[in-house]
Amino acid sequence: MEEPGAGFILNMTSDSKVRAIVGRIRGLAAKTVPPPEMSWFDSQFDPEDAEGPFLPFSTFLITGTAGAGKSTSISALYQSLNCLITGATAVAAQNLSNGLKTYCPTIYSAFGFKSRHINILPRHGRNAPARDMEGIQRNELCKYWPVISDILGEFTKKKQRGQYEHLTGAAFGALAKMGTPTLWTTNIIVIDEAGTLSSHILTAVVFLYWFYNSWLQTPLYKSGAVPCVVCVGSPTQTDAIQSTYNHSMQKHHIQECDNILTFLMKHEAVSRYVDLNHNWALFINNKRCTDPEFGHLLKTLEYNLDISPRMVDYIDRFVVPKSKILSPLEYVGWTRLFVSHREVKAYLTALHETLSLNQGGATAEADARLFTCPVVCEVFTDTFNEYREAVNLPGLTVTEWLQKNLCRLSNYSQFIDQDLSAVHIETGEESTKVTYLVKYVKNSYVSLNGKTKKCICGFMGTFEKFKTILDNETFIDAHSHDQPEYVYSFLNTLLYNGMYAFHKHGLDAGDEGYLDALRRLPIPPNITHLSTFQDALDQTEAALLNPESDIFYHMTCAPPSASSASLSTLISFYMSLKSVFLQRLALAVSRFGRDFAERTFQTFTINMMIQNGVDFTSASERLFGLLGYASNVDTYKLKGYTFIPVGFGRFNQAELSRDLRDKMPVVVVEDPHGFIACLENNVNKMTEVMENGDLIHICTAGDYGISSKLAMTIAKAQGMSLSRVAVCFGNSKFVRKSHVYVAISRATDPRHMVIDCNPLKNLEEDREDNKTSKYIVQALNNPDTILVY
């Protein structure tokens, strides 16, 4: 029997403490109060002018060393309690989705934040400093009220007032279990990586919980169930920033602000109200990487301990020349981490130039082909002129505005990281259309940046892999919850179209004996269109006259569509096609050996050709397949693109003009099981919010909604575990401790981590970190704190 690893043992020893965490959170969630009167908060209310009722809440804090199991402990909460699991960032939400095998939204998405709210500026808050919890809550509410009030307006239009007023608690509980948790179906809200959120987000979550439940008149509101916000993260790893945009200067202003974790620790009135001394759990030992010296290093940074010469020497062993990290030909397949977006873009540009010269030959990637796809932006003339007048910049041109706002255009896709260049500008009366080319690498891994529709249209893998999928019925189990007839119809089409692969191999091998045996394999009667023995003879003779022709297609019917056949008929057809596939595979393996099962097998819903390795083309006028939403759980491998029109089931959507939509292909990706899917293009609307509150829709941009995993900023990697990581701290004279901490703690194995310098030799003195560490050390000495080793 294999001996359990150190990480497994550490997780098992922490089991009892995690149970204690679940128990305390369950106790907090059971608290009730007289429901606050929410009718105060109507469309005329503003916390800057009037004081509303205090909104009770409770919090539980989970902090600790990077990789110590903070995020993993969330799975215990998910299994034990009815709770809404969210991430502070898209990456954190994706990691949670991956671990829990369920959809976890960002906290912004959970409370109703939309892309248009990005440009609504937070206020500075009331001038008078608040010393009690009521005043602090009002101050925090003031900061975010412009966004909150807009969310309230949209919610009250969409949801009927008193919608759940007459439901019993049991009926409401059953209804809540049928769907995904929301702010009005549970009072336990978990936020992973909460250290990246500004403090006012906590108050926004509390306020919107009470407002939503009051508006819908849920049993939660009527019973006065107090929201329990579980904040997970590390205050020494992360910073919260606040971004504002100066329209007159066309420039971003970014400044640090209190994050939720430090807000709970530092403000005495807040920590006393939430009883932080009793509602705090600290995870101590790193379980992501169980190397003792590595774990000691992380604890030293976490608790702001003195850095010994021995520790500096330990870090020296990871240092390699910066040129090796920046060279795409070194450390192939490793994820690069950089401090700034500019460095990420520079590395990707260098990688793409190397690939264009080597065509993947020197990169140890069998098919790392470089290809480009257009990204399009359409700036509307009338609204752009209105914007120029509003900000008093009459000389501002479209190209200048685009150059300064390109990173803001993509709310999800992070244009600024991508290697793209403008190739075409077309100016018309109604709009200016700008086309950029963005470079991608075939077979590189990408993540999705939003909720993306997909159309599964094929399979690329091996015969053995497809057989395993059929035997285990994993695909059917994963996709047949709502309309199983479409799943069976899709698989029938793949099986039917894929049968020719067996015949083609026999032709290429020139093996007449194998082809003859293939013809003799029986065909189930429910999939054949032949009614008499003479019909069978005629079709066999026709097939023999054309050696390229597979007799299977002469003898069988094309699979019926999901709309024209019953589920039982589709399942019967599937079982027969599966039987034929397995018989053909067994025959081929017996004839050509076990190696045949590992040969490439490709099948699509239409007759597909792949030109230049990346361009999926067909004589068919439309590409159809199984529709669904692409999973944030999965990492996708980029395979190419297609200009074949794909039906994503959306109608009357014209965010982009027709000629721009025609310029953009859809990207083709492979999921972890080998199924090929097209991803719907991502469309972003750029709406500026003026100081007087007016909304101006200036521009619409179309992109692909994907981010490369070849390189990213250290901030974006927050919460990730990376098997091979190369960190470049750049040319900064001083390195921030939080950057060092996050970057090196991503590694799961110190043997597969390299850095370009020893950051411990030039750490930036950060007084804020020292303050935070003081509270953490106090918690370590507090007997009421739950310590998880």
From Swiss-Prot:
Intracellular or extracellular location(s): Host nucleus
Superkingdom classification of source: Viruses
Chief location of this protein within or outside the cell: host cell
Top class in the EC scheme: hydrolase
InterPro entries: DNA_helicase_dom, HSV_HELI, P-loop_NTPase
Signal peptide range in chain numbering: none
Enzyme Commission number(s) of this protein: 3.6.4.-
Keywords noted in UniProt: ATP-binding, DNA replication, Helicase, Host nucleus, Hydrolase, Nucleotide-binding
GO cellular component: host cell nucleus
GO terms for biological process, alphabetical: DNA replication
Pfam family, one: Herpes_Helicase
Molecular functions (GO terms): ATP binding; helicase activity; hydrolase activity
Key word ATP-binding present: yes
Subunit structure: Associates with the primase and the primase-associated factor to form the helicase-primase complex.
Protein name: DNA replication helicase
Organism field: Equine herpesvirus 2 (strain 86/87)
